[in-house]
Amino acid sequence: MEFLTSGKVKDLYDVDESTLLFKFSDRVSAYDVKFKQDIPRKGEVLCKFAEFWFNELDVPNHFIKRESENEILVKKMKMLPIECVVRGYFYGSLVSRWKKGEVQVPEGTNTTLAAQLPEPIFDPTTKSEHDIPIDKNKAIEMNLVSEEQYNWLEKTSIEIYKKMAKITDDVGFILADLKLEFGILDDQITLGDSIGPDEYRLWPKDSFEVGKIQEAYDKQLLRDWLTANGYQKQFDDARDNGQEPIPPNIPSEIISKMTERYVTAYEKISGKSL
């Protein structure tokens, strides 16, 4: 088995001509900045969530099997250069982009923070160091996907979001948004990468309230702490000056809270204990 590359969270290994191994680490990143500290058990939760969702969703995917507490085997495929984001709530970057006039929201949208959208929207981005939002025309113009592929990705991504939202709703969570990646396997568009709290926002229903920052059972907890303490602005300022942002130390209470919430989310949604 040959080591291929390290991503923000996963290490990839070449197993054979048709198989990859994903090793999930406890690493964490936010706002495209990698942090020095780990989040204990995060890799295990992401790994087992990937197994759960791939088995739960009725859509062709690259998952073969879980190999260990933090490793899965997947089929190799050619990934499509587009990140398929589905948003069900007026939150996150959608809010700032809407305020700048960079994106339209469905007619009748309540533009109060965290309000549910009338219908989930497909809001894809490029796949790059800093993902750039794109629309259908741009995706086709940039030769990222064909029109037929785009239409399929939009329809399927929204269907997956709705199914996942129903599953999370049944156990007391709101799935606010979701990021999916697809590839081509045997001439068929196939769900790839992994699905877990690094790919979606998850809010507990019992504390949900429109107009406020929501309690996060995902990576948003770290993002909110960074924003509240001025670090997001520091990162942006550093990049504007051509410098690499310097990650601060994450407080121990944020680290332990992230571990606790990741574990709780998995146990409630999957019905299995870790």
Swiss-Prot record:
Keywords: ATP-binding, Ligase, Nucleotide-binding, Purine biosynthesis. Its EC number is 6.3.2.6. It catalyses: 5-amino-1-(5-phospho-D-ribosyl)imidazole-4-carboxylate + L-aspartate + ATP = (2S)-2-[5-amino-1-(5-phospho-beta-D-ribosyl)imidazole-4-carboxamido]succinate + ADP + phosphate + 2 H(+). One of its GO terms (biological process) is 'de novo' IMP biosynthetic process. Pathway: Purine metabolism; IMP biosynthesis via de novo pathway; 5-amino-1-(5-phospho-D-ribosyl)imidazole-4-carboxamide from 5-amino-1-(5-phospho-D-ribosyl)imidazole-4-carboxylate: step 1/2. The keyword DNA damage does not apply. InterPro entries: SAICAR_synt/ADE2_N, SAICAR_synth, SAICAR_synthetase_CS. It comes from the Archaea. GO terms for molecular function: ATP binding; phosphoribosylaminoimidazolesuccinocarboxamide synthase activity. SUPFAM superfamilies: SAICAR synthase-like. Belongs to the SAICAR synthetase family. NCBIfam families: purC. This is Phosphoribosylaminoimidazole-succinocarboxamide synthase. The lineage of its organism: Archaea, Nitrososphaerota, Nitrososphaeria, Nitrosopumilales, Nitrosopumilaceae.
